[in-house]
């Protein structure tokens, strides 16, 4: 395939699996338009749905220490989810962070500020650094293009395992 860029976004043929429609729009943009956008309501209807969800979670977790658990990387997305859950939804989330050896000082600082600012609890699971390095080296040697798989697998499995062990039913992502 010759070089091509989506007529709607910046995705291009550097993604070897990308496909374009007859108008030059990539499959990612088309998927967003047909699948995500019709269900994406940031207005009054979305706020009402979020409030209803919060009330259901609160009713379901009466008498428990936490309403939900949120995986926290220290980046923008998970930090915003934590803010929305605690401040907008009025939930009592437990923030769950996995230290797989790659924490930057900025991420650690972001996490500390967020926890202090929201007044919520944080649990950090520390992954064995030697095992993580061995996995990452194995993925590199195997030529696997997605080098985040070892960390992502550790993050999600630790999060869900902790939630199950501690009977925290609601996971917010």
In which residue ranges do the predicted regions lie?
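ATP-dependent adenylation/nucleotidyltransferase module used to activate substrates
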Residues: 3-173
